[in-house]
Amino acid sequence: VHTIVAVENVSLDGVMQAPAGPDEDPRGGFIRGGWATPYLQADPEAAMAAFTGRAAHGAAPGGMLFGHRTYDDVVGYWLTTTEPNPFSEVLRASPKYVATRDPDVELAWPASFPLVGEAIQTVARLREQGDGDLVVLGSGALVRDLAAAGLVDRYVLTTLPVVLGQGTRLFAGTPLDLEVRWSTTSPSGIVTTEYAVRRP
């Protein structure tokens, strides 16, 4: 069985909307897009902590899972950037599963596979069909739906020292009992923590 791991950048007030760029996701009148970028550019150790930390604590690669919007934004950017970086290498090497309701979806990047239908059902089937970690990047609506269905097993949260005061929050109404698996603090004070979801 796959383990589903949500990897997110969050503010101190729990916002995860549009961390990378000003035009990434302006829905709801959000004007703080790109809020995480200055912190992570100034602290490369923090920018990769979710992945280096997971590797150091025995992560088992199984693939990546995206909502359709995040797939287009994230994969499109990181697979076209000309700057060498380890994240692009991880993306290229990983199978990429995309939850979508569009039966005619065309996915632009190699090793990309559509999960067509209702995400809770398609992801639940995928979860039962393999092993290793399925890492969800961003994809806030997908993560919240999966959490409500009890399908998220772990969260790796990189918490940045900023309060945004607006924007979509990662956790929205689903109570969770979490256990810290590991935590690391970068030189600039950015904290990355992996939490396991405790099941009843």
Where are the predicted features?
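Enzymes that bind and transform nitrogen-containing heteroaromatic metabolites
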Residues: V1-P200
